Amino acid sequence: MHRNNKRRRRRRAVFGTCIMFIGSLLLLIGGVTMVMRNWTTSVQAAGNPYGDGGWQLMLVNRWHPIPENYAPELTELWNGELVDSRIYPDLQEMFDDARDAGMEPYVNSGYRTHQLQQLLMDREIADYISQGYSEEEAKEIAEQWVAPPGTSEHQIGLAVDISMEDTSDQNASDVWQWLRENSYKYGFILRYPEDKTDITGIGYEPWHYRYVGKEIAEDIYRQGICLEEYLK
């Protein structure tokens, strides 16, 4: 009888140990599931930096900085300027058609490094200081025209500043008019329209065009909106 009691106690102990092990395992699995669920939620909450439409819809402005370590593959143009290689074919087609229409456009500024963007910002601030503004005032005004480093579309290679070979005001005006009316056909949009400065955070720049893809560019053009409004 005493021996039977011992056996029963051993069986209970073994059974209890098994129950504890199984319980711990279930808790562990549940914890991992919860961690994975939380991780997935965090990723979804953080959002896709490329937007729902892929890389060409990446939103970059003072409220949406460039993703860390973003490094596009670049193509060098004839004048040494660089652009994201994926936009080059459509950019070239747009310029070819503009030339057929009597224009002579070229990319005055394409991809910029962080250091170059900082240099441009520093120069802009210094220029306003030389006009008598305080450093704080100069910085505030400069940021209306030059995006702070880390928030410029030029740093992702999808934006181009377009000028004319003949830099007279009339010729520049003609090419910008042509671009306003036709750039969407090639996947580009006027990025900083005159009536959207309160939304984009940047002053009107008739020379600054951004690649978003042909279908989306046409949607934006037809609706008369800016990229921020499209992505809402």
Regions found by a protein language model. Give the residues of each.
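Extracytoplasmic cell-surface/polysaccharide-interacting catalytic and binding patches
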Residues: 2-232
